[in-house]
């Protein structure tokens, strides 16, 4: 297969940096490569904090001459373990993720600091109008107007979603003591038996004893926790 030559790439890089007023320590040349470090939100934050200029080099065909990477590239980044035709889509992902944290790009920092992965947690569920849609209703706490209760609900939902869908994120960003206490409560609540049918009220009979004991034993273990 074809390989991109080193000198044309070097000439393009020199042209891109020719008019740059950014000092070298604040510049970063990144090659989008399947062999690179996996790009994450944490990496995006680090790039935004440490550098004022990013030059993204997009490979094509079989890749680029290794000598160009050795001489000119500061680091390699990958957006995942899959194959693309070229590095352009990866460059767009990096550009969007980093630029949205630049002041003025979005109207408010809250536009991105509360989203999934920002703090190593998944975002809480979102709702809008109407209040009821196809039999599904917006949670009552969100309709009550109590901001403290809404914040508490969002925190719990964020932790529970992360626990269920992406528990690996807790290894990367360990829970705080407050989060750990809430996670313990979430686990206890999720382990409780859930009623699938309305309860039937009637006097107990002798043949109900095995079923009663079957319920009592796990209940006893739960109360001992």
What are these regions (language model features)?
Residues 29-31, 76-78, 201:
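Conserved beta-strand scaffold positions in the cores of enzyme catalytic domains, especially
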Residues 15, 156, 186, 215-218:
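Residues within well-ordered alpha-helical secondary structure of globular protein domains
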Residues 130-198:
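SAM-dependent methyltransferases
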Residues 89, 101-141:
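Internal, active-site/partner-interface "lid" segment
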Residues 64, 68-115:
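Structured adenosyl-cofactor binding patch, chiefly the S-adenosyl-L-methionine
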Residues 200-214:
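A short beta-loop-alpha structural element at the N-terminal edge
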Residues 213-225:
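Conserved GNAT-fold acetyl-CoA-binding loop/helix
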Residues 2-60, 66, 103:
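S-adenosyl-L-methionine/SAH cofactor-binding core of RNA-modifying enzymes
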């Amino acid at each position: 297969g074809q390989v991109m030559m080193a000198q044309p790439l070097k000439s393009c890089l020199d042209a891109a940096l020719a008019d740059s007023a950014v000092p070298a320590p604040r510049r970063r040349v990144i090659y989008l490569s399947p062999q690179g470090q996996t790009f994450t939100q944490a990496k995006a934050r680090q790039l935004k904090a440490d550098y004022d200029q990013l030059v993204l080099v997009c490979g094509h065909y079989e890749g680029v001459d290794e000598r160009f990477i050795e001489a000119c590239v500061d680091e390699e980044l990958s957006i995942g373990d899959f194959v693309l035709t070229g590095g352009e889509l990866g460059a767009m992902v990096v550009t969007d993720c980093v630029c949205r944290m630049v002041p003025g790009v979005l109207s408010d920092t809250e536009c991105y600091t509360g989203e999934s992965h920002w703090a190593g947690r998944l975002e809480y569920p979102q709702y809008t109008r109407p209040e009821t849609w196809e039999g599904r209703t917006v949670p009552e706490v969100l309709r009550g107007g109590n901001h403290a209760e809404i914040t508490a609900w969002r925190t719990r939902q964020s932790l529970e979603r992360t626990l269920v869908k992406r528990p690996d994120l807790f290894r990367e960003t360990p829970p705080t003591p407050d989060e750990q206490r809430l996670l313990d409560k979430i686990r206890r609540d999720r382990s409780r038996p859930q009623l699938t049918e309305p309860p039937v009220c009637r006097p107990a009979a002798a043949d109900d004893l095995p079923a009663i004991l079957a319920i009592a034993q796990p209940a006893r273990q739960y109360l001992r926790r």
